A protein has these predicted regions:
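Conserved RecA-like helicase motor-core motifs
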Residues: 56, 73-89
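Alpha-helical structural signal in soluble globular domains
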Residues: 67-78, 155
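Helicase C-terminal subdomain and adjacent C-terminal extension
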Residues: 112-178
Length: 178
């Protein structure tokens, strides 16, 4: 199964970083790690370790990959699972598979610019690495401007789940105004 976690209403934005014009979306990466931990908790940490359920975290941007690696290294709650976690770029994951894949798309901008996410061969590599489950985090508002991603999003987010997420965000916004 494919799950798309839409970050459109979360005000996550991509940033340029370093001389290489790398892109990073720290808030999206942080959410990905929260979702990963919640998924492990749902399965059961003991079961994950006993059955050696492995996880891949993929992002098309090296800066995002490095940020995720650093956060995992610093995370006490993910420490028992580090040997089961692989974090890499799309190109770095070519030829590999994992039981569960999380993808951080990074791109979140008002112009709908998605850079080399336009290269569908690379995205094919990313979305075909999961043996059991694929979770994609990305801003649907940015990505839906492109036909492939619109169709992927539409098949990944049933309308009742999308409404449930929007309701949940609304409740959180009301409870924790910024």
């Amino acid at each position: 199964p494919i799950n798309w976690i839409d970050t459109s209403d979360m005000d996550f934005k991509e940033e340029f970083i370093g001389e290489t014009f790398g892109r990073i979306n720290k808030a999206e990466a942080d959410l990905l790690l929260q979702e990963l931990k919640a998924y492990i908790d749902r399965i059961g940490g003991k079961r994950v370790l006993e059955e050696r359920i492995d996880f891949g975290i993929i992002s098309p941007y090296k800066a995002q990959v490095q940020y995720l690696r650093n956060k995992i290294k610093a995370s006490g709650s993910l420490k028992p699972y580090r040997s089961l976690l692989t974090v890499n770029t799309v190109d770095g994951f070519q030829g590999q598979e994992r039981d569960v894949i999380f993808i951080s798309l990074v791109r979140a901008n008002e112009d709908g610019q998605i850079g080399f996410l336009n290269d569908l061969r690379r995205m094919n590599v990313a979305i075909t690495r999961a043996r059991m489950k694929l979770v994609i985090l990305g801003e649907a508002e940015t990505m839906k401007r492109h036909k492939f991603y619109k169709e992927l999003i539409d098949t990944s987010i049933p309308s009742h789940r999308l409404a449930e997420r929007k309701t949940h965000r609304l409740i959180l916004k009301y409870l924790f105004p910024s």
